[in-house]
Structures are given as C-alpha cells and as structure tokens.
From Swiss-Prot:
SMART domains in the cross-refs: PX (SM00312)
Organism placement in taxonomy: Eukaryota, Metazoa, Chordata, Craniata, Vertebrata
Keyword RNA-binding: no
InterPro entries: PH-like_dom_sf, PX_dom, PX_dom_sf, RA_dom, SNX17-31_FERM_F1, SNX17-31_FERM_F2, SNX17/31_FERM, SNX17_FERM-like_dom
Protein name as catalogued: Sorting nexin-17
GO cellular component: cytoplasmic vesicle; cytoplasmic vesicle membrane; cytosol; early endosome; endosome
Gene Ontology terms, MF aspect: phosphatidylinositol binding
Notes on the domains: The PX domain mediates specific binding to phosphatidylinositol 3-phosphate (PtdIns(P3)). Required for association with endosomes.
PTB-like F3 module: region residues: 270-432
Protein task: Critical regulator of endosomal recycling of numerous surface proteins, including integrins, signaling receptor and channels. Binds to NPxY sequences in the cytoplasmic tails of target cargos. Associates with retriever and CCC complexes to prevent lysosomal degradation and promote cell surface recycling of numerous cargos such as integrins ITGB1, ITGB5 and their associated alpha subunits. Also required for maintenance of normal cell surface levels of APP and LRP1. Interacts with membranes containing phosphatidylinositol 3-phosphate (PtdIns(3P)).
Annotated organism of origin: Pongo abelii
Annotated spans, FERM-like: 115-432
The family this protein is said to belong to: Belongs to the sorting nexin family.
C-alpha cells in the first residue's frame, strides 16, 4: 500500500479552541484519515513501548513555538517518510497498534458513529450478499461475516479477500484495491459517496493448485465456478470457439468441477484485469491492457493490423520494481503546501531480465499502478510460501470482548447464466512469453519524486538465472 501525506490543513479546535495543523494521510491516493501531530506522536510512543526505540524510524521532534509555513512543510515531509517506513516494516506495519490507530483515525475523520448496519457485498457474478456488521468492523470481521452468511468453512476464509471496486456503466469492475487490515470496509466504501463503488468477494490466491482445497467444499466450489464464468463472459479469460463449446456443454450438464478443470488450462485463468493504460513497451506511449496472474504481468496490445499481441513478464525475472507518483502543477505556478495540486500521475516501473546479461526498465502509467504493485508482491509472497512448503491457510483473529450476532440464514451461490459466444478476435492472440527464472524485489517511491536506489528493497526469492533458462 502507498502511504502519503500530500497536504496539510489549518483547522479550528472543538468548541472554538485554538487552531491546529491537520495532516491528511492518503492511502493509494485517497484520503484515509486526518490527524494531528500529537496523535502521531502518541502512536510513536505506543510503538516505542511495545517494540523499543531502536526499531523505530526517525520522527520529527516537538517544537516549543508555532511553526512557520516552511517548518510545517518540513514536518509534513518527515511525517510522510515516518508513516511509509513504519508501514513497510514487517513487524511495525502489521502490528495491531499501528493498524488500530489507522482504523480509529479513519472512523473519527469520517465522523461515523459505531452502530450496526447492513453492508452489501457482491460476488463476482454480481450476486448480492447482505451482512449485518458494525461500522467499526475491520476487514477481517466483514470477511468472516460474509463467509458465515454463505456457509463457507472457517478453514477456507483465507483463500478469499474483499476488494474495493468501481462498477462501470457496462457492469464491469475496475479494481481500486484489496481491502486491508487497517481500514473499516463500511467506512471505506461509504466515504467515497458514490454508488459506483462496491465491495466484491474474490479468491485471494494466484496458484490454481490451491483450487483443489477450495473445490472440496460445496460453497467454495460454487464461488470459484461463479467467478470463472463471470471472468470468461467479461473476456478476462481467453477462450477459443472450440474451448467455448466444451465449456458451454459442461455448464449445461452442471459439471462444475469438470468446467473448472478445463478453465484452469485456459490463458489468463485466475488473472486480475486492469483498465486500459499506457506503457513504454514495446514502444513509447503504447496503449495496453494489463492483467496479473500466474506469477506474471501480461501486456496486451493491438498492432496497426488489428492483430492482438501479448507480452508476458514473469515476476521471477523482475530484479526490482517501484511505484512513483507525481503531481503536475498548473503552468507558471510554484509549489505551495496543500495548494495548486493537480491529479496524481502514478507509474509502475520494473527492471526486467530480458536476456542473461540485459536488464531493461519497463514503465506502465496507470491510476491502478499501486494495485498492480500489490499484485506483484502478493505473487512473490505466495511463491515464497510455496517454496518453503507452507500453506496459505491462516489463523483468523477472533473478536475481543464478545461477538456480533449473525443471521443464521444462508444464501446459496446461484449458478451463472450460460456463456455468451466468445469474441472472434480472441483467437488471433499471439503469446510472446519467456521461461521461468527466479528474481524479485519491491520498492515504492515518495510522492512527487522518482524513487531512488534506497527505495528498492531486497527479497529472498533471488536465485539467479542460468543459460538453460534463456
């Protein structure tokens, strides 16, 4: 996740109190919460007591007198670096102290009282699931509530996640982000104040081998089936006419497992597809459609002759990647804290091993660049878990201080309608992919600047590449 503090505000205290400076914390370019310096100082003290001062990043010191505008800007930059460093630290960033602070701050900023509400969660096929939750319930609480409503077993909950999406006019989903442990889903979706934004349940893993675990259960099987049919209908999974005929026959027979077995062999099965964007590969300002899955990023582009081409970039051949953001200022203006800021431009850049001795940077410019980066990192994490012989099943945190009463009614996952005929142009897809090797890193840049070498962090997945891999 990309944390930033792009702006500050001068606000009046409660009941006419003295004015203070508020720091607006953004996550992936969207306002998450508004906090005072004293609140962040309190968070630092809590982390220091719990983990010790040695592990904490540098924090801007207190000042005896009121800050000048230049000092406010300097403190903003220092606090931004502090929040980014804490979030990227495996220990601090995953701590309940840090995450609960962000949840409380989000709720306070949006002024949402704690109360029981009905929250709508969509399945991949558009089916609605209504769950009773508290406005203060975190992401895992809501995920558990959805699983309970669907009768999905506890040991399969970790195979699914909640995603914030924007529903487009044609009914397709544009992925905004995967909901995280530091946010409150009800507050996150309602604070956007638009009916376009929805919460969707999808599987959270990339390796189709894990499908076997999910398919053992009736509800898990239905969820995978519904997602796969939906992805095929949207053109996210590439299907030839003959494959489409076989799938339709299996669907008519309600042979869900056989349907999924065939779907697993199809190109882009289990991928997330992003909105059309621009890349500098194979040439500058090239319009592409990016998909993530199966340990790779796929870039589809249409050549002048209307033929579709695809370039596949294996995550294990990416030496590093970074996300950078820039905010263009109006022509002739100068930088001023919190003023004159335009729309944020996001870029994902990765250094790719094109051949044994040749590395090349590939840059994708997209509002969804951070989501793409998160997908890359989760694919690396999954590869490392599998390499170490681990499992993606996880122990779920249980509520402290009581449970929220859930409805006992169950909602079956309906079978989707029969598949429509595939687009004939999909058969002209030509794949340009590379063999597997093993390199991966991650990094993220500061707002308004290019990432420097210090922004790129190592990953234990590095194994090198040999002649046989090329």
């Amino acid at each position: 996740m990309h944390f930033s503090i792009p702006e500050t505000e001068s606000r009046s205290g409660d009941s006419g109190g003295s004015a203070y400076v508020a720091y607006n914390i953004h996550v992936n370019g969207v306002l998450h919460c508004r906090v005072r310096y004293s609140q962040l100082l309190g968070l630092r003290e809590q982390l220091r007591k719990e983990y010790g001062a040695n592990v904490l990043p540098a924090f801007p010191p207190k000042k005896l007198f009121s800050l000048t505008p230049a000092e406010v800007e300097q403190r903003r930059e220092q606090l931004e670096k502090y929040m980014q460093a804490v979030r990227q630290d495996p220990l601090l960033g995953s701590s309940e102290t840090f995450n609960s602070f962000l949840r409380r701050a989000q709720q306070e900023t949006q002024q949402v009282p704690t109360e029981e509400v009905s929250l709508e969660v969509l399945l991949s096929n558009g089916q609605k699931v209504l769950v009773n939750v508290l406005t203060s319930d975190q992401t895992e609480d809501v995920l558990e509530a959805v699983a309970a409503k669907l009768d999905l077993p506890d040991d399969l909950i970790g195979y699914f996640s909640l995603f914030l999406v924007r529903e487009k006019e044609d009914g397709a989903f544009s992925f905004v982000r995967k909901l995280q442990e530091f946010e409150l889903p009800y507050v996150s979706v309602t604070s956007l104040r638009s009916q376009e934004y929805k919460i969707v349940l999808r599987k959270s893993y990339w390796d189709s081998a894990y499908d076997d675990d999910v398919m053992e259960n009736r509800v898990g099987l239905n969820l995978l089936y519904a997602q796969t049919v939906s992805d095929i209908e949207r053109g996210w999974i590439l299907v030839t006419k003959e494959q489409h005929r076989q799938l339709k026959s299996l669907q008519e027979k309600v042979s869900k497992k056989e349907f999924l077995r065939l779907a697993q062999t199809l190109r882009h099965y289990g991928y997330l597809r992003f909105d059309a964007c621009v890349a500098d590969f194979p040439e500058k300002d090239c319009p592409v459609v990016v998909s993530a899955g199966n340990s790779e990023l796929s870039l589809q582009l249409r050549l002048p002759g209307q033929q579709l081409r695809e370039g596949s970039f294996r995550v294990t051949r990416m030496r590093c990647w970074r996300v950078t953001s820039s905010v263009p200022l109006p022509s002739g203006s100068t930088s001023s804290p919190g003023r004159g800021r335009g729309e944020v431009r996001l870029e994902l850049a990765f250094e790719y091993l094109m051949s044994k001795d040749r590395l090349q940077w590939v840059t994708i410019t997209s509002p969804q660049a951070i989501m793409m980066s998160i997908c890359l990192q989760s694919m690396v994490d999954e590869l490392m878990v599998k390499k170490s012989g681990g499992s993606i099943r996880k122990m779920l945190r249980r509520r402290v201080g009581g449970t929220l009463r859930r409805s006992d009614s169950q909602q079956a996952v309906k079978s989707p309608p029969l598949l429509e005929s595939p687009d004939a142009t999909r058969e002209s897809m030509v794949k340009l992919s590379s063999k597997l090797s093993a390199v991966s890193l991650r990094g993220i840049g500061s707002p308004g600047t290019d990432a420097s070498a210090s922004d790129v962090h190592g990953n234990f997945a590095f194994e090198g590449i040999g002649d046989e891999d090329l």
